[in-house]
Amino acid sequence: MRPPVYAELQATTNFSFLRGASHAEELALTAEALGLTAIGIVDRNSLAGVVRAWTAAKRRSIRVLTGCRLDFMDGAPSLLCYPTDREAFGRLTRLLTIGQLRAEKGECHLTWRDFLDHSEGQLGLIVPPRVLDDSFEQHLTRMAGDLRGRSWLAASRAYAARDLQRLARLESLGRTSGAPIVATNDVLYHGPERRPLQDVISCVREHCAIQEAGFRLEANAERHIKSPEEMARLFDRWPRAVERTVEIVERIGFDLKDIREQYPDEPVPPGKTAMQHLTDLTWKGAAWRYPNGVSPKVTAQIQEELRLIEKMDYPNYFITVHDIVREARSMGILCQGRGSAANSSVCFCLGVTAIDPTEHRLLFTRFISENRGEPPDIDVDFEHDRREEVMQYVFQRYGRAYAAICGTVIHYRPRSAIRDVGKALGLTEDVTSLLAGTVWGSWGDGLPEDHLRNAGLDPKAPEIARAVGLANDLIGFPRHLSQHVGGFVLTKRRLDETVPIGKAAMKDRTFIEWDKDDIDSLGLMKVDILALGMLHAIQRAMTMLREDHGQDWLKDLADIPKEVPGVYDMLCAADSVGVFQVESRAQMSMLPRLRPREFYDLVIQVAIVRPGPIQGDMVHPYLKRRNKEEPVDWPKPSPEHGPPDELQEILGKTFGVPLFQEQAMSLAIEAAKFTPDEADGLRKAMATFRNLGSPDAYRNKFIEGMVGRGYERAFAERCFKQIEGFSHYGFPESHAASFAKLVYVSAWIKWAWPDVFCAALINAQPMGFYQPAQLVRDAREHGVEVLPPDILTSDWDCTLAPISTGFRPPRVRHDKVACQETRPRWKAVRLGFRQIKGLRETLDIPPLLKARGEGARTPAEFAQGGVPQKALELLAEADAFASVGLSRREALWAVKGLKGEHKAPVQAPLLAGLPLFEERVALPAMAATQEVAEDYRTTSLSLKAHPIGFYRSMLAARGVVPAERLLSLKDGARVSVAGLVLIRQRPGTAKGVVFVTLEDETGVANAVVWKDRFDAARNVVMTASFLIVHGRVQRADNVIHVVAERFTDLSAELSSLRDEPGAPAPRIRQKVSGRLLRSRDFH
């Protein structure tokens, strides 16, 4: 007897949000393991999950069918829709686009009429409701008649008492309507073990606890994939229902591999092809990039790249990116390409990238390779405040029917998973909050039992253990779709005939359902239009330098003076607060050890403080060899296998240590004799080592390949271990070089013009590692005067102002480096109104500037000028009226006394002759502590004093020393330091170590918290805002840390800042909480 065959045609992934309880990949691989012919992915009104299932099955025996469950708004039963060819698939995606664009984000509104308009080439399985009433019979007859031989009736076993009667009824309805029954198991998860999770997400969807869910949950755990034998047994009275599943599969000719969209044609000059136009643009750019002539080496590189671009039919793509960059620059928007595109001389000549790949010997095959056959991927960073202008240009140029932003998947993270699971299981809010509070950062490190115990929870308690297990299952599930940060997909045919397009939350934005990984799997080309805060800061800095300092020669990144020794002096001193990419504690610790003296050193600096080199044990060998503390050893292949210097060619500039992905690929090709295709497979496998372990095929081939060519086995194994490190995020050299450019530019601005640097960084917030309070402090330590927000002189942004009369620049701290030649020309930084919490740029500032221009000085005059009362209160509380002789309390009193909010009040005749506004009264002065507390509450910083200075005597009594004392303490000395917690950082490569930065009135102290100490004091380390760290001094390479042993949380003490004599009248609104300044936490 022939074994049964079966295809599951009703499988729901977790992209049917809060319904499916398995990943698409799990469904596909389980279907293969159980021997199914095919599996059809039919998410609700969505194609978001199908590419993942298709990708997982690409090289396997299981076939994944692309389908969709269409739910209708007009009462028609749902339909499992399967397109039979490419054109039918285009109709389905257009249908879904129509439904999504007419609805709110995340919804899709369709009618049966909509479907009929797009039904050509579609097969449909009609999904019966639970109750088979007369209206369903009418719908069934109509739908089957409309589809004329292309419809079936989906029949599933509900495992209920009346199952067989229901199936018999469906079989009868199918026979009379012309839509015969077909067996499905209406799959919601790949295996029965996922049933509890499906119950939980059903409760989340239905907004109820599991105790009250009742019939809203599935009755059993049978909605999983079943084998052909099991389905044949379940439908033994209706064997044709099982056989029809395979017959339907045979009628479906469409496969996702059929999607190979052409890139849109670009307009070119008359008589020119796209390739000829690209060639002209490239050589024109080469003349601009190389004003002294294009060398033979560069010429050969450009010619080879153009040959490959033509062969692979990519010229239109390069013209597109060139056009976008050209348009951005015409609008005065700073931009720079990065990533693998920096390997291309064509991109460099087109002005897309800023790094000369021939100068740095970068590998073009990392960008484009005919062996890989993958489309190029160009990432371009734009100023983050102006990127939207560039994106709207792309929409306008190509049309929304041909351009859209990639989707991105918002996943469940530990905290959100815990909260949803806790609600579903009926846990109290207190218990759920305690569970969520054990998670560090957004992804955390799971829910270890010791963390639960530290939070006062018993990990063995059944309800806790169950919640933790289900939360761990839910982590990584998709919650909803959103738009990618800037990946554009452009197509020659209508994009909505390739993928559904939906509404984004942002006005005038649309995005597709597939994310960048889906796009890569399908081979579609995209352009990444990304935002980078540092570019915005640099552009603002260059504008200030031209307008305030007369540096008219400075117009572009290329104009920045190159290789200035003072810039490297500053970086070697780890004086890098605010400098792009090298401002973290790890980078600051590395700078004095690496001691950069030229641009390529910055490339190394960017790349070396990454998880890849750290995990691959590359950092210490590189530093020792660079600093001549150990010799560089160059193992050689046997003479018959290659030149003795083959490793030196690959690793010479990094002292024999592979720091970059390109070097790993070259090592595989030259030393282990991988083909370029195999080396690219190794590059891709780097991304999977962390999750799947090292594939033996690559390990063995690499090691045996090197050993077979005469290298020692131990050396070959060490090389592969270093390559494995790249699975933990290592930089390509091209990417590091692009970022190093911005490291140098931002460092030069900080060194030469720290006044401009401070103002530009604050104006570009939010960005970077530090908050305005630390940027201001750093500027003042470099000798820059910083002035508070002022009602008469501030703008929204920070501006440069004349130095105050009597200002005496402080001596620059010994650990701070600045240009002495420009120092006499530095100006003061006037903080802008942006620093005052609650003020609105578009509503509050225009009337304020207008009133000020008309002579307003007092609160009453600004009120008469139309400044809202709320804005005047915020300005008064921020002490912005000091320049007109009003203290904080006096200004607030005056504002509170105004009789009208936006204009002077109309005076009643009875009150004629009385003053319109309250007269000035004598109010008690605020204590210094209160002034500082109010500064922090209103502007997040204070120029008057540092809060910790008020606690110095108390701290001294506890044996706590100021941060500046660390400079004079010996290695190993016991010490206690205290301060506001600025930054908590827990890198994934640090094996549980946490780095904490404290700030007091004398400087900053950096504490290292080893894992055991962190686990013992987890809550204090994670939450304290004012902290004493007790430990020992660690000094190495001019870097000082405190290795923490224990902690004292003083956060509650901060509330005493306002507890001074002289209560405000009227009382300033808010209390100062125990958190003056919110830390920035990184993980």
UniProtKB/Swiss-Prot annotation:
Keyword Nucleotide-binding recorded: no
Origin: domain of life: Bacteria
EC number annotated for this UniProt entry: 2.7.7.7
Keywords: Cytoplasm, DNA damage, DNA repair, DNA replication, DNA-directed DNA polymerase, Nucleotidyltransferase, Transferase
Induction per the UniProt record: Up-regulated in response to DNA damage in a RecA-dependent manner.
Keyword hit for DNA damage: yes
The protein's name in its UniProt record: Error-prone DNA polymerase
Species whose genome carries this gene: Caulobacter vibrioides (strain NA1000 / CB15N)
Taxon lineage: Bacteria, Pseudomonadati, Pseudomonadota, Alphaproteobacteria, Caulobacterales
Originating gene: dnaE2
